[in-house]
Amino acid sequence: MAHKKGQGASRNGRDSESKRLGMKVGAGQRVSTGSILVRQRGTKWHPSKNVGRGRDDTLFALIDGIVVTRKTDRTYISVLPE
């Protein structure tokens, strides 16, 4: 006889709620001051010109302008004035 019950469904079905991380605006889009550009854990994307970094590594715009991404050894996000 089996020493485990063959019930599956009632004991499964747990998962954590998604955290909605990632880019919130794409390159070339217009943003206003304080707009969230990226939600992330750690620094997958790094702040560059006119971009601030919050305590939870969220990147946000410091000025009104256009979002620009640049990839070297790291991916940088900046906001250029219009």
Curated annotation (Swiss-Prot):
Disordered as annotated region, ranges: 1-51
Record's keyword annotation contains Ribonucleoprotein: yes
Any GO MF annotation of the entry: structural constituent of ribosome
InterPro entries per the UniProt record, alphabetical: Ribosomal_bL27 (IPR001684)
Highest taxon of the lineage: Bacteria
Record bears the keyword Ribonucleoprotein: yes
Example of a GO cellular component annotation carried by this entry: cytosolic large ribosomal subunit
Entry keyword set: Ribonucleoprotein, Ribosomal protein
Coiled coil: none
UniProt record, GO biological process: translation
Family: Belongs to the bacterial ribosomal protein bL27 family.
Entry protein name: Large ribosomal subunit protein bL27
Organism of origin: Chlamydia abortus (strain DSM 27085 / S26/3)
Originating gene: rpmA
